[in-house]
Amino acid sequence: MLDSKLLRTQLQDVADRLASRGFTLDVARIESLEAQRKVVQTRTEQLQAERNARSKSIGQAKQRGEDIAPLMADVERMGNELSEGKVELDAIQAELDALVLNIPNLPHESVPVGADEEGNVEVRRWGTPTAFGFEVKDHVALGEKFGWLDFETAAKLSGARFALLRGPIARLHRALAQFMINLHINEHGYEETYTPYLVQAPALQGTGQLPKFEEDLFKISREGEADLYLIPTAEVSLTNIVSGEILDAKQLPLKFVAHTPCFRSEAGASGRDTRGMIRQHQFDKVEMVQIVAPDDSMAALESLTGNAERVLQLLELPYRTLALCTGDMGFSAVKTYDLEVWIPSQDKYREISSCSNCGDFQARRMQARWRNPETGKPELVHTLNGSGLAVGRTLVAVLENYQQADGSIRVPEVLKPYMGGLEVIG
């Protein structure tokens, strides 16, 4: 959530910066609501002062033996007007709050300006795609050959965009997640965390999924109790660990990592990636979250992105790193890097990780703060998140990049300890 003071004092500048994201800020509506709020607030404050004075005069008139009925009637009338003013003020503030909750974050000055993914800037590449001496198969053909990747049974159970993994491929999927978690806790300094997979609405509002992206979520309604939502990413539960907290400076940075299933309705993805495991309603992901002091967040973004890249390097999977442009960034981000892994069957790079610095945007929504030792006052922290990595898409990349002419799959060197020393699948 943007700073309301910024919206009041630099509204047009905010609108111009948001325009670079393709977002049109309703400046006129915000100005109108702010003007109404000021009028009602001023009138209410004046009325309260007048009522206080009139209440004081009642006691004085009573001491003088005067009729206080007219004064009492005035005080009662003013009380009613104050109540009406409060209702009016609350309604104006509620509309302002609703507007602000749907405004995306402001892009950092270093973010390239662009309308869509065509404006993204490649920062670096690592590895060289293999030149196969045979016809490349996609992960579906490779997995279905031995019955280890079963979309037909998954569809019978759950419908479209689900996968059933069996045997060595299920084991390889588990091995990838274990490898990622171990790398992040042992080498990158993250704290392993197990979180709920169901959260209430305030948690999703805190990280920015609600109210704007409710159609992308799976919701569980419960009579007489708060609705629950299946997490679309562990970013939600991990980041909200510090919701409503005031952290000591010595606690920062906090670095959390979790392996969880993620659930997304993919409401806007009709017709896209309908084959295979690239876009699923349910998928596993290893998620990294950092909570840092504001001055440290841009450096933390580089570090967090490097942590995700290290996974791909150790798996020896070719990838590229992109700086997302203003028009392609996520709602809560001030700056984002995407990692794209090489998928041989598609002859192109596909997203496998998104690493973002959200500045104080999520912290303001969550009221997550730290006590600045220089001022002694609570101030908003900065939050970062990144996939380290999406397990299903990493499995796809391993299956395709490590395939052999007979359809078997070589096991990456770093995964062999997790596969009982198995060297080849199939």
UniProtKB/Swiss-Prot annotation:
Q: Which pathway does the UniProt entry assign to this protein? A: Aminoacyl-tRNA biosynthesis; selenocysteinyl-tRNA(Sec) biosynthesis; L-seryl-tRNA(Sec) from L-serine and tRNA(Sec): step 1/1
- Subunit structure, briefly? Homodimer. The tRNA molecule binds across the dimer.
Chemical reaction(s) catalysed: tRNA(Ser) + L-serine + ATP = L-seryl-tRNA(Ser) + AMP + diphosphate + H(+); tRNA(Sec) + L-serine + ATP = L-seryl-tRNA(Sec) + AMP + diphosphate + H(+)
Q: Which organism encodes this protein?
A: Pseudomonas syringae pv. tomato (strain ATCC BAA-871 / DC3000)
What does the UniProt entry say about where the protein is found?
A: Cytoplasm
Q: Which GO terms describe its cellular component?
A: cytoplasm
Family assignment? Belongs to the class-II aminoacyl-tRNA synthetase family. Type-1 seryl-tRNA synthetase subfamily.
Return the EC number: 6.1.1.11
Identify the keywords attached in UniProt to this record, alphabetized.
Aminoacyl-tRNA synthetase, ATP-binding, Cytoplasm, Ligase, Nucleotide-binding, Protein biosynthesis
**Protein's name according to its UniProt entry:** Serine--tRNA ligase
Q: What does the domain comment read?
A: Consists of two distinct domains, a catalytic core and a N-terminal extension that is involved in tRNA binding.
Enzyme class, one word? ligase
What is the protein's major site of localization?
Answer: cytoplasm
The UniProt entry, under HAMAP family, shows:
Ser_tRNA_synth_type1
For the ligand (L-serine), the binding residues are 233-235, 287, 387
